[in-house]
Curated annotation (Swiss-Prot):
Keywords: Endoplasmic reticulum, Heme, Iron, Lipid metabolism, Lyase, Membrane, Metal-binding, Microsome, Monooxygenase, Oxidoreductase, Steroidogenesis. The lineage of its organism: Eukaryota, Metazoa, Chordata, Craniata, Vertebrata. The keyword Repeat does not apply. One of its GO terms (molecular function) is iron ion binding. Its cofactor is heme. This is Steroid 17-alpha-hydroxylase/17,20 lyase.
Length: 508
């Protein structure tokens, strides 16, 4: 009996052994692993994954591999190797893994965030870039849209003067409406049931992504009931139902002479493809309603929670450092004053503010670990071979917290992005990729940077954001999902006296 069991275990171990394509090649050093379960028993059970993987670099080096179940994953934690993956060999590593959770979220590899490399992903990414180009100039200029929503946000917060509030909901409304103007050329009013629906499904998706879904590591388990997958399906169905209603209205009212939103542009591309007006490269199957909904869903998923979260991180760090907040406000007062509101042209003058935003993106990156990439061909990273189909994860936390690249990396020091005189922004290290890079870089980076600057500048010009009367400071620990979220906290809103006096003068 024992002999038979031993034989079966050996047979399983042999069957699931790593298949090395090039026996003579040098592969990254690997964590220990067992048949079927891979390296899971050898991974730390407590703490944030990005921190744990960073700590493993002390033993295994800046590039190492592990097995998630039977699948090999390479972890990259040095900027030179990361840039090789993302830029130099960006096309070779531009694939995406196919796992159950993300397949549901992307409606089976549709959209621009989680779709594998191929014609659909290339086409939709190209169209999204074209859509952002609609907002370069004129009345639809991106800056005007952001300033409009920021103004409404400030007006809303002014009604809360002297009160202690959670910024999450008002920020979510403002950031969501920026995305709505881009995608639909419309916006939501405070209290709209659709907005609450959107906020709830966003929260549900992030909660699902936060959990370690065993089915993503062991796909065979898909045949069994799974609460996480069911929750993801439920949230995605709600999202698609909401977006489908908007989509249908846009199709009914579509006017090819008035392309004012991303959805208009996608509908136009579909009509052109259906009419064979754009050549053989645009197959109408790639522009099905499901493909379009997935792309719009990705823009919302990537554009709303990310910016909302980073603004809250900025406020949290300023609450911990009131002297820095005061210096930024003095900078705004001197360079902008109160007779007008901040614009993007002020970025060259509000250097401490810009440095603070950059430092927040360093110390609390939007995604501590980038969405996994996949090797499309047999390739290499540095001196190490990487086989076709291998998953590759860039540990952004490791890049941004490398002691050899950053002085006291765990300290919040915006001044590191300024020269000694404080009169010029600098790049203190090449180990800084807050929005990724290469073919899979964040497609909304320009939008995000503009939002972060304008939201923060307007808020600090108009308000004193203060610690509540109970003295409760926000936790800076956070918890990573697809986005590095900050735990909810409250802030006391006070309209600045100087702003109030300036407005009173202007009205007389």
């Amino acid at each position: 009996m024992w002999e038979l069991l031993a034989f079966l275990l050996l047979a399983i171990a042999y069957f699931f052994r790593p298949k090395v394509k090039c026996p003579g090649a040098k592969y990254p050093k690997s964590l220990p692993y067992l048949p079927l379960v891979g390296s899971l028993p050898f991974l730390p059970r407590h703490g944030h994954p990005h921190v744990n993987f960073f700590k493993l670099q002390k033993k295994y080096g800046p590039i190492y591999s592990l097995r998630m179940g039977t699948k090999t994953t390479v972890m990259v934690g040095h900027y030179q190797l990361a840039k090789e993956v993302l830029i130099k060999k960006g096309k070779e590593f531009s694939g995406r893994p196919q796992v159950a959770t993300l397949n549901i979220l992307s409606d089976n590899q549709k959209g621009v965030a989680f779709a594998d490399h191929g014609a659909p992903w290339q086409l939709h990414r190209k169209l999204v870039r074209a859509a952002f180009a609609l907002f370069k100039d004129g009345n639809q200029k991106l800056e005007k849209i952001i300033c409009h929503e920021t103004s409404l946000l400030c007006d809303l917060l002014a009604t809360q003067n002297g009160q202690t509030i959670d910024l999450s909901s008002p920020l979510f409304l403002a950031v969501t409406n920026v995305i709505c103007w881009i995608c639909f050329n419309s916006s939501y009013m405070k209290g709209d049931p659709a907005l609450e629906t959107m906020q709830n499904y966003h929260k549900g998706i992030l909660e699902t992504l936060e959990k370690d879904n065993v089915v993503d590591i062991f796909p065979a388990l898909k045949i069994f009931p799974n609460k996480s997958l069911e929750k993801m399906r439920h949230c995605v169905n709600i999202r698609n139902e909401l977006l489908s209603k908007i989509f249908e209205k846009h199709k009914e009212n579509f006017n090819s002479d008035s392309i004012t939103s991303m959805l208009d542009l996608l509908i136009q591309a579909k009509k052109n493809s259906d009419n064979n007006n754009t050549g053989p490269d645009q197959d109408s199957k790639l522009l099905s309603d499901k493909h379009i909904l997935a792309t719009i869903g990705d823009i919302f998923g990537a554009g709303v929670e990310t910016t909302t979260s980073v603004v809250k991180w900025i406020v949290a760090f300023l609450l911990h450092d009131p002297q820095l907040k005061k210096k930024i406000q003095e900078e705004i007062d001197q360079n902008v004053g109160f007779s007008r509101t901040p614009t993007l042209s002020d970025r060259n003058r509000l250097l401490l503010l810009e440095a603070t935003i950059r430092e927040v993106l360093r110390i609390r990156p939007v995604a501590p670990m980038l969405i996994p990439h996949k090797a499309l061909v047999d390739s290499s990273i540095g001196e190490f071979a990487v086989d076709d189909g291998t998953n590759v994860i860039i540990n952004l936390w490791a890049l941004h917290h490398n002691e050899k690249e950053w002085h006291q990396p765990d300290r919040f020091m915006p001044e590191r992005f300024l020269d000694p005189t404080g009169s010029q922004l600098i790049s203190p290290s090449l180990s800084y990729l807050p929005f990724g890079a290469g073919p899979r870089s964040c497609i909304g980076e320009l939008l995000a940077r503009q939002e972060l600057f304008l939201f923060t500048a307007w808020l600090l010009q108009r308000f004193n954001l203060e610690v509540p009367d109970d003295g409760q400071l926000p936790s800076l620990e956070g918890h990573p999902t697809a986005v590095f979220l900050i735990d909810s906290f409250k802030v006391k809103i006070n309209v600045r006296q100087a702003w109030r006096e300036a407005q009173a003068e202007g009205s007389t």
